């Protein structure tokens, strides 16, 4: 089955690579319109997926990721339309010039070819990834989590109908609908057809891909994000940032999971934190230095377990640790961070600059929420993933991250001397 999908995707990629920006946008507009026109079938499929997932004990955080509503589906369709408005990087001349030999040389952006994406219970990813791949002239093979089988099947059927109505092959966007995990291992060895693989899931999936894949892999999406509250931070303003970073949408990978508090501000900061977190419904997981003081406040508090510093809660839970200074905070982030998004709240710009220079994450913030690490917020449009590695892309992966380049030399029957 996967062999045939690979063949179809590779053939489709050749046709997609020849499309003009106008032709690609016409396809995307058709997909957006059809997602809205056929919303009932997608929402019905999703309701069945959610019911099964709840019966099987899926966590509330994962159920939130899985669930579609009419408003969320309209938002997904609108995101596709936003991709239409983005500049098409394909065909862009990155640099070039005329060599001493007279050869005119340029470096031009081109599609990667076929992208493989493995992800969990995130039906929006199906459309986001498909739209970005189509905009950049790439075919895509999707493997969503078993919890989203019906939703993905309904969504991909709508996308394929839109492709065919525009004269393009359905093989441009395909989904593996068999939940058998053995197919993941088979997919990881499809280097004959897939040019780049993006796993969006937990640490176990990333480890599997790194160990078994014969395809270049871009990993990311695991967000153990930190905020360091420096001793010079403005408490009231800092709390606004922390509330946003923790509570706006707790199930996302750019949500803060650990708060590092400078010991010199702890006595005044912790009582205010407890009051604010109680109002926000957040459970605090406190270290020994913070526990007694937080227990005197209104927020729910438990003693932190050592392993929780490495946890991506994806829920209304927040670690709180007292640190001696900036060096201590940076050391903690280096040991427990996932190189996703980390922030410092401070009025000391020297400390801010040190934090920016010494924290090796894909996104580092000064006096701002970690929730900004998002393709839309960065002006990139919908994102295919957030890469936490350094090659071939880093941070939110927009359109340019789905391209490569080729060198083109134009001469007048020019030969090398």
From Swiss-Prot:
Main location: cytoplasm
Domain of life: Bacteria
SUPFAM superfamilies (UniProt xref): ALDH-like
EC annotation from Swiss-Prot or TrEMBL: 1.2.1.41
Class of enzymatic activity (EC top level): oxidoreductase
Keyword Hydrolase part of the UniProt annotation: no
InterPro entries linked: Ald_DH/histidinol_DH, Ald_DH_C, Ald_DH_N, Aldehyde_DH_dom, G-glutamylP_reductase_CS, Glu-5-SA_DH, GPR_dom
GO cellular component: cytoplasm
Keyword Membrane recorded: no
Catalysis performed (reactions): L-glutamate 5-semialdehyde + phosphate + NADP(+) = L-glutamyl 5-phosphate + NADPH + H(+)
CDD domains noted in UniProt: ALDH_F18-19_ProA-GPR
UniProt GO molecular function: glutamate-5-semialdehyde dehydrogenase activity; NADP binding
GO biological process: L-proline biosynthetic process
Pathway(s) per entry: Amino-acid biosynthesis; L-proline biosynthesis; L-glutamate 5-semialdehyde from L-glutamate: step 2/2
UniProt-listed PROSITE patterns: PROA
Family statement: Belongs to the gamma-glutamyl phosphate reductase family.
Record HAMAP family: ProA
Official protein name in the record: Gamma-glutamyl phosphate reductase
Organism, as annotated: Escherichia coli O1:K1 / APEC
């Amino acid at each position: 089955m996967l062999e045939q999908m690979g063949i179809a995707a590779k053939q489709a990629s050749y046709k997609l690579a020849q499309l003009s920006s106008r032709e690609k946008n016409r396809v995307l507009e058709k997909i957006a319109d059809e997602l809205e026109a056929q919303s009932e079938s997608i929402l019905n499929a999703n309701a069945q997926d959610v019911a099964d997932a709840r019966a099987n004990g899926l966590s509330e955080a994962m159920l939130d990721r899985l669930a579609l509503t009419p408003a969320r589906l309209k938002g997904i369709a609108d995101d596709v339309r936003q991709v239409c408005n983005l500049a098409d990087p394909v065909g862009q001349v990155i640099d070039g010039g005329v060599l001493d030999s007279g050869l005119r040389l340029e470096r031009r952006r081109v599609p990667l070819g076929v992208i493989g994406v493995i992800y969990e219970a995130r039906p929006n990813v199906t459309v986001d990834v498909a739209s970005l791949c189509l905009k950049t002239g790439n075919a895509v093979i999707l493997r969503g989590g078993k919890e989203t089988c019906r939703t993905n099947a309904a969504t991909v059927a709508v996308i394929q109908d839109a492709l065919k109505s525009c004269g393009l092959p359905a093989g441009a966007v395909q989904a593996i609908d068999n939940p058998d995990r053995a197919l993941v291992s088979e997919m990881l060895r499809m280097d004959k057809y897939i040019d780049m693989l993006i796993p969006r899931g937990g640490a176990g999936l990333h480890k599997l891909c790194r160990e078994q894949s014969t395809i270049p892999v871009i990993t990311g999406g695991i967000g153990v994000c930190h905020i360091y509250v420096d001793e010079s931070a403005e408490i009231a303003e800092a709390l606004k940032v922390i509330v946003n970073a923790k509570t706006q949408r707790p199930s996302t990978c750019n949500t803060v999971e650990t708060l590092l508090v400078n010991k010199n501000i702890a006595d005044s900061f912790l009582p205010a934190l407890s009051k604010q977190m109680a109002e926000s419904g957040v459970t605090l997981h406190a270290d020994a230095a913070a526990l007694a003081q937080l227990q005197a406040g209104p927020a729910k508090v438990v003693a932190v377990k050592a392993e929780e510093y490495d946890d991506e809660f994806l829920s209304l839970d927040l670690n709180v640790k007292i640190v001696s200074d900036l060096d201590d905070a940076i050391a903690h982030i280096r040991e427990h961070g996932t190189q996703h998004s980390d922030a410092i709240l401070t009025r000391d710009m020297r400390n801010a600059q040190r934090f920016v220079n010494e924290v090796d994450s894909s996104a580092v913030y000064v006096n701002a929420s970690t929730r900004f690490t998002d393709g839309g917020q960065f002006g990139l449009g919908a994102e295919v993933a957030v890469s936490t590695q350094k090659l071939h892309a880093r941070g939110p992966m927009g359109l340019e991250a789905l391209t490569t380049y080729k060198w083109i030399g134009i001469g007048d029957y020019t030969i090398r001397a």
